[in-house]
Amino acid sequence: MEFWSSAMSRNLGSGYEAIKSPWADYAIYSLPDASRIEACDRQPLMDAMNGIIAVNWQAAEPHWTATSSPFDQKYSLILVYDGSGLVAFSVYRILQMSAGLGIYRSGTEVLPAHQGRGLYGFFTAEVLKCSGAAERADGNVLYGWRTRNPIVWAANAKICEKVSPSLLDDAQDPALQAACVEMCTSLYPGKPLELPDMIMRGAYGHIKHHRQAYRGTASLVDAAMSRKIPNSADALFSVGYARV
């Protein structure tokens, strides 16, 4: 996978303004409209993003490509750099659902050496802030993600009042199940969900998640995932009511 990372950007460039960073050694850029990335910066940045994915996953081919680009106007981006280059990123979308505002976490990756520093939680807070979710008086925000990573599932479920599918109990929420189907149909036309477990078959045919030792809630989630989606190409599509 070296050819994906050889052109990694070492910074985003002076044409972009960094936001306030909680870490002295990270420069962070938050772009609600990913199409603001200039054409000349797109390939190096995409190579860097694919390079991180190739570290965290067994990847047969690049995940982000010119035909499946993270720089479409429909996406928003958060990028984290240190002195060596891009170390983490998050791609997300803001959706108008029939039940109101929707947020979808399209993909978040952090290099192993930078995991455990709170970047995932920072990304989540920034996504909620930029989406306008924090200003909603009713607090009714649908928050969706697709994964087979137990840590990611547990981290996202933690910020939700309820989640479908509910991996840790047998609770069923018809409204959330309907939201899962609506969001999935909007994002991935032609990719059906298997109800009630919200399984998306073949979601990760080109990449395979690196398994690891899990602790706490993540270990319980891992056990549930191992039962429901033993095939490494399958994923769970989840939607919850975000606490804002």
Protein language model annotation of sequence segments:
Residues 2-40, 132-244:
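Terminal substrate-recognition subdomain of acyl/acetyltransferases
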Residues 5-9, 56-59, 82-87, 121-125, ...:
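A short linear-motif detector with a strong N-terminal bias
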Residues 74, 78-80, 89-92, 121-122, ...:
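Hydrophobic, well-ordered beta-alpha structural blocks that scaffold small-molecule cofactor pockets
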Residues 90, 105, 124-127, 238:
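Polar/charged side chains located within well-ordered beta-strands of beta-rich proteins
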Residues 110, 115-131:
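Conserved acetyl-CoA-binding loop-helix of GNAT-fold acetyltransferases
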